[in-house]
């Protein structure tokens, strides 16, 4: 009886070990893909800069396009209010 229980425990242990290894390998693969994508994005920004575009402005536009239209409008309104208060507009 103890041998059967030990065998089941060994199978469960092996399954958990294999599952953990698979998860870790997936994460490592995704991290490598993320690095590749980050490198590609950096190359695109470098290309844009080489063509005379302002990279800071491009990054701002990309960030703004990710926002919901209402959220972006609210942020722009607040920014404009602050700029007016400081005499910048």
UniProtKB/Swiss-Prot annotation:
HAMAP family: UPF0335
Annotated GO MF terms: DNA binding
This protein's name: UPF0335 protein OCAR_5086/OCA5_c28780
Species annotation: Afipia carboxidovorans (strain ATCC 49405 / DSM 1227 / KCTC 32145 / OM5) (Oligotropha carboxidovorans)
Family designation: Belongs to the UPF0335 family.
Pfam families: GapR_DNA-bd (PF10073)
InterPro entries: GapR-like (IPR018753), GapR-like_DNA-bd (IPR046367)
